């Protein structure tokens, strides 16, 4: 009886001591992972104005448009840091000023 109680107690302690980690991939099926300061719908008036000024064609874009984006690079031992929205984008224009075809993702929950 003592051995059975000991095993049950040990397993319970092990379960409590093990941290639960839920991780999602920080990779995209297509495109690249970026951190964007702002996200807009591709058919919004703001994006229409920006696209016109930059001569970008956003008609038929699947996904949102990210503004002021930078590539999300994993930090050694610390994961990735993003104070904006983490997204997966199909196209990067003007060094990340505008990213096209973006969809939100979760990184390192």
Swiss-Prot record:
Could you tell me where this protein is found in the cell? Answer: Secreted; Secreted, Cell wall
Where is the secretion signal located? 1-17
Annotated GO molecular function terms are:
structural constituent of cell wall
* GO terms for cellular component: extracellular region; fungal-type cell wall
Grouped into one coarse class, the protein's main location is: secreted
Keyword annotations: Cell wall, Disulfide bond, Secreted, Signal
| PROSITE patterns (UniProt xref) | HYDROPHOBIN (PS00956)
User: Known Pfam families for this protein?
Assistant: Hydrophobin (PF01185)
Cysteine-cysteine disulfides: 28-88, 35-82, 36-69, 89-102
Would the keyword Aminoacyl-tRNA synthetase turn up in this protein's UniProt record? no
Top-level taxonomic group: Eukaryota
- Subunit and partners: Self-assembles to form functional amyloid fibrils called rodlets. Self-assembly into fibrillar rodlets occurs spontaneously at hydrophobic:hydrophilic interfaces and the rodlets further associate laterally to form amphipathic monolayers.
Q: What does it do? A: Aerial growth, conidiation, and dispersal of filamentous fungi in the environment rely upon a capability of their secreting small amphipathic proteins called hydrophobins (HPBs) with low sequence identity. Class I can self-assemble into an outermost layer of rodlet bundles on aerial cell surfaces, conferring cellular hydrophobicity that supports fungal growth, development and dispersal; whereas Class II form highly ordered films at water-air interfaces through intermolecular interactions but contribute nothing to the rodlet structure.
Q: Which family does it belong to?
A: Belongs to the fungal hydrophobin family.
Supply the name of the protein: Class I hydrophobin 7
> Encoded by which gene?
Hydph7
């Amino acid at each position: 009886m003592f051995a059975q109680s000991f095993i049950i107690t040990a397993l319970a302690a092990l379960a409590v001591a093990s941290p639960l980690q839920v991780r999602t991939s920080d990779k995209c099926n297509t495109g690249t992972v970026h951190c964007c300061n702002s996200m807009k719908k591709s058919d919004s008036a703001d994006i229409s104005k920006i696209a016109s000024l930059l001569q970008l064609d956003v008609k038929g874009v699947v996904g949102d448009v990210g503004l002021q984006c930078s590539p999300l690079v994993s930090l050694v031992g610390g994961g990735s840091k993003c104070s904006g929205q983490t997204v997966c984008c199909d196209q990067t224009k003007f060094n990340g000023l505008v990213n096209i075809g973006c969809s939100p993702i979760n990184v390192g929950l």
